[in-house]
Amino acid sequence: MKLLPSVVLKLFLAAVLSALVTGESLERLRRGLAAATSNPDPPTGTTNQLLPTGADRAQEVQDLEGTDLDLFKVAFSSKPQALATPGKEKNGKKKRKGKGLGKKRDPCLKKYKDYCIHGECRYLKELRIPSCHCLPGYHGQRCHGLTLPVENPLYTYDHTTVLAVVAVVLSSVCLLVIVGLLMFRYHRRGGYDLESEEKVKLGMASSH
């Protein structure tokens, strides 16, 4: 069904061309008749030359038929060209745009994929060079250097001070415990000595 409009159009063009060719031949005959009427007593040879003979007319008819056949053959042999629809044109433009966007890819995804050792690659379009965003603890152009942790002197001083205070407190507690035990033992021993002296005195008194 899609080929029908193009075939009809070509047939119409062929008919127009054949009409034009026929019109040209009729125009020639009219010119000859006009020349004959303008010269009423022309020589016999001139009139015979202007008026076509039967053989000439038959030849012209054959030529016209051959021309029409050639036009019809050309019309049927040529392949119809599909008309471009707006939808197809839009799809073509979208495909072209997609191809153009595909060329502008991030070089860090392919060319500089392994450029940063311990970090993330970021391409600087203005400078046209890759840059690395290093992970914590790494430094350098390609994040290849390891940053060693440095102790804070203030933090070290505070830690030492706390340990010293704790040691002093524990030592003081130990000394207090030792002193308390000694005092308790001495007090107990003093009471035991008094009891023994009283027993000795009582024994001596009973012996007398």
From Swiss-Prot:
Which GO biological-process labels does this protein carry? cell chemotaxis; cell migration; epidermal growth factor receptor signaling pathway; ERBB2-EGFR signaling pathway; ERBB2-ERBB4 signaling pathway; negative regulation of glycoprotein biosynthetic process; nervous system development; positive regulation of cell growth
UniProt note on tissues of expression: Most abundant in skeletal muscle, lung, spleen brain and heart.
The answer to whether the entry has keyword Cell membrane is yes
Post-translational modifications:
O-glycosylated.
Highest taxon, organism lineage: Eukaryota
Which cysteines are cross-linked by disulfides?
C108-C121, C116-C132, C134-C143
Cytoplasmic topological domain ranges are 185-208
**Which ranges of this chain reside in the Extracellular compartment per its record?**
24-160
User: What transmembrane ranges does the database entry give?
Assistant: 161-184
Annotated region described as Disordered, given as residue ranges: 82-103
The residue ranges of the EGF-like domain are: 104-144
Q: Which InterPro entries match?
A: EGF-like_dom
N-terminal signal peptide = 1-23
Name the job this protein performs: Growth factor that mediates its effects via EGFR, ERBB2 and ERBB4. Required for normal cardiac valve formation and normal heart function. Promotes smooth muscle cell proliferation. May be involved in macrophage-mediated cellular proliferation. It is mitogenic for fibroblasts, but not endothelial cells. It is able to bind EGF receptor/EGFR with higher affinity than EGF itself and is a far more potent mitogen for smooth muscle cells than EGF. Also acts as a diphtheria toxin receptor.
Q: How does it assemble?
A: Interacts with FBLN1. Interacts with EGFR and ERBB4.
Protein name, entry field: Proheparin-binding EGF-like growth factor
List the lineage, top down.
Eukaryota, Metazoa, Chordata, Craniata, Vertebrata
| The gene coding this protein | Hbegf
